[in-house]
Amino acid sequence: MHVTTIFDTVPVNGASPYEVVIGSGLTPLIAERAAGSGATQVALLHQPALAEVAADIDGALQAAGLQVLHLEVPDAESGKTLAVAGECWDKLGAAAFGRRDIIIGLGGGAATDLAGFVAAAWMRGVRVIQVPTTVLGMVDAAVGGKTGINTAAGKNLVGAFHEPDAVFIDLDRLHTLPDEEIIAGSAEIIKTGFIADEEILRLYESDASACLQREIDGSHLPELIARSVRVKGSVVSADLKESNLREILNYGHTFAHAVELREDFQWRHGNAVAVGMMFIANLSYNLGLIDADLLERHRVILDSIGLPTTYQGGVFDELYEGMTRDKKNRDGNIRFVALTAVGEVTRIEGPDRGELIRAYEAISS
């Protein structure tokens, strides 16, 4: 049996405080938390590739006296649809799933987003425990209470704020991930470095390979995950519903979401965020907000772990249309989260279209 080891615990305060537990061998703690919630049933939402992991958690839940209902959903963004959510609700209804019962979201960011949305809507809100299994899910999607599904109009335009009961980040799951998943998820970690924690950037600059290493000994990844979660936890504790401060977590995301829409959600989110950060860094440089060194620092760090720094997949007009749909926009103006220095965030509102074209040309040539 794998020994349970806790690496760090990050509190997320606010209206409904919870903890993010980071460690290894956490399945017993997941079952203990669910059993202590007063639930009689647990709905375990997961993707087909995680059937074996789900079976392990199922066994622990049943040993704790809980009935387990499996909600197997399609992989990645294809599972984040109203149709899939509807199928989940139908199964909950057939099982007489009650208000005291609990949903567990097991998987990457798409699975935890969907689990949170299904939980938020069922009986106007039941509890959810998030168990992210990808780097992206660990540092971004599973923390903060944002849930959602995709529609033809765009990504995450339908959703709800629904804070989890707890988040368990089991570092053992890193061993199951392909290299490209760890690389793509690292874009969100790097993002938090630029907006709030320069030590994250220094770790990548000191030894990029250690930042991707799965084995705990000698790896920077556990510390990077913990630091990134701590940044996000601090931000969402102060601003759950994205009224102001939480917007800083969208650094690089305005252009990223346009890319994802253009690519019909077939691009990895982290890769889109990487080119999104390069886009806003170039725009900020052209507007005199940052210097050439900070612009180059973006490129060097992203490139050091194999993240894309250019994008040639669409004409500007298509991407511009995607940016006009961004949730941060106000009064018809496209709004960008930008930097003036590492850890110093500002906003760019309604920039000249010519400047946007110039920034796009810099990353598409």
UniProtKB/Swiss-Prot annotation:
CDD domains: DHQS. Binds 1 divalent metal cation per subunit. Can use either Co(2+) or Zn(2+). Zn(2+) binds at E188, H253, H269. Gene3D superfamilies: 3.40.50.1970, Dehydroquinate synthase-like - alpha domain. One of its GO terms (molecular function) is metal ion binding. It holds the Pfam family DHQS_C. Its cofactor is NAD(+); Co(2+); Zn(2+). Signal peptide: none annotated. One of its GO terms (cellular component) is cytoplasm. NAD(+) binds at residues 75-80, 109-113, 133-134, 146, 155. The keyword Ribosomal protein does not apply. It catalyses: 7-phospho-2-dehydro-3-deoxy-D-arabino-heptonate = 3-dehydroquinate + phosphate. InterPro entries: Dehydroquinate_synthase (IPR050071), DHQ_synth_AroB (IPR016037), DHQ_synth_fam (IPR030963), DHQS/DOIS_N (IPR030960), DHQS_C (IPR056179). It comes from the Bacteria. PANTHER family: 3-DEHYDROQUINATE SYNTHASE (PTHR43622), 3-DEHYDROQUINATE SYNTHASE, CHLOROPLASTIC (PTHR43622:SF7). Catalyzes the conversion of 3-deoxy-D-arabino-heptulosonate 7-phosphate (DAHP) to dehydroquinate (DHQ). Belongs to the sugar phosphate cyclases superfamily. Dehydroquinate synthase family. This is 3-dehydroquinate synthase. The gene is aroB.
